[in-house]
């Protein structure tokens, strides 16, 4: 086996261990779906999940989800710089997602009802930041930058201000 093939295989093992869907792992590594399914079963002891990936507008559908996604996107921008608007870079995605998880663990109680963004949704957002399907918007009231989708399901406006208003 060539060094490049070993590297792609090791990357696939890491990404599957992190919970990335096989369609994404295949896209990133170029490995055949059958190889990835076999690898997934060997690593996880079960068949891989199936079904479509979420859309960015679905990920941003509620104010809380939009706020959580915005925290991830800000972490991703911090690790990837301005280049995230041109292309998705795997190291920046993984580093940004790890930072996001650290922040969530530090500030949200374990029994919190708020759903933590999973890595597949994070990948969708990173991909869509590169294509312009999602973008940052700065709030005119609190100055926080939050994530919006061009095809939005969530109401317009800042999710942080909306959540603060709701909790008063």
Segments (PLM) and residue ranges:
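Long, charge-rich, low-complexity intrinsically disordered regions
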Residues: 1-14, 18, 22-168
């Amino acid at each position: 086996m060539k060094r490049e093939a070993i590297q792609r295989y090791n990357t696939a093992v890491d990404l599957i261990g992190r919970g990335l869907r096989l369609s994404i792992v295949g896209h990133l590594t170029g490995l055949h779906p059958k190889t990835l399914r076999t690898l997934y079963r060997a690593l996880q002891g079960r068949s891989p999940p199936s079904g479509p990936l979420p859309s960015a507008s679905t990920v941003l559908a509620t104010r809380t989800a939009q706020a959580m996604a915005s925290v991830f996107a800000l972490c991703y921008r911090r690790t990837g710089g301005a280049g995230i608007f041109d292309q998705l870079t795997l190291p920046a995605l993984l580093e940004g997602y790890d930072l996001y998880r650290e922040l969530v663990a530090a500030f949200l109680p374990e029994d919190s009802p708020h759903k933590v963004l999973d890595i597949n949704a994070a990948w969708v957002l990173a991909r869509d930041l590169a294509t312009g399907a999602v973008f940052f918007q700065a709030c005119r009231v609190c100055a926080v930058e939050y994530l919006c989708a061009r095809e939005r399901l969530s109401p317009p406006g800042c999710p942080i201000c909306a959540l603060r208003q709701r909790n008063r």
